[in-house]
C-alpha cells in the first residue's frame, strides 16, 4: 500500500475497487434472490415473505461478520419460516460452516479484478479449476470474520501464478484487504442462503 501511495496509484486503484465492490454486492443480492425464489417454489411459500423473514439474520451477519455468531438469529428466522425444529437445528449450524456462496462470489470476483488491474493473464482455464478447488476448500472455512479469504490464500496461485500468488506477496495482500472491506456482505449472503 505504501508503494501505491508513493507511485500515485492509490486513487486510480480505489476508483476500480469501488466498482468491484458494487458488482459483488449486486451479485450477492442476485444470489440471495435466486435461492429464495427456488426455495419458495419448492416449499410453495411466498419467496418475498421468506426474504422478509431473513432480514434479522442478514443484518446480524452484517454487524458481526460471523456465520457462527449469526446461528441463533438464523434459527429464529427459520422458525418464522415454518421450518420444523429438527431440520432447522441440523441445517442452520451445518450450513453456517459449509455454505459459503457469498464468499465464493467475492473471492472469485476480487481475484478476477486483481488480475485485470495487474495485467495478469486470466482465462476460463484458470478460473474454473480455481472455483472448483475453492468450493471444496470453503467447506473447511471457519465461520469467523475473514476466515474464507484465509482459507483461499493457498489456492490463489492458481489464478495469479506462482510468483504473484505468493501468500506473503503484495497481490495477495490486496486480495485480503479487498475481501475484508466487504466481508460483512459476503457473510450476510452466506447466512441468508442457509435459510433458503
Language-model features and meaning:
Residues 57-138:
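Helix-loop-helix junctions within the multi-pass membrane cores of secondary transporters/permeases
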Residues 26-27, 41-50, 82-88, 120-129, ...:
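Membrane-interfacial loop-to-helix junctions in multi-pass transporters
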Residues 1-15, 47, 117-121:
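Transmembrane helix-loop junctions in multi-pass membrane proteins
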Residues 9-36:
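Entry/N-cap segments of selected transmembrane alpha helices
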Residues 26, 30, 34-42, 114, ...:
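Alpha-helical membrane-inserting segments
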Residues 1-7, 35-44, 159-162:
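Structural signal for alpha-helical transmembrane segments and their membrane-water exit/capping regions
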Residues 17-25, 54, 58, 94-101, ...:
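Loop-to-transmembrane-helix entry motif
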Residues 108-196:
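Transmembrane alpha-helical segments and their short flanking loops
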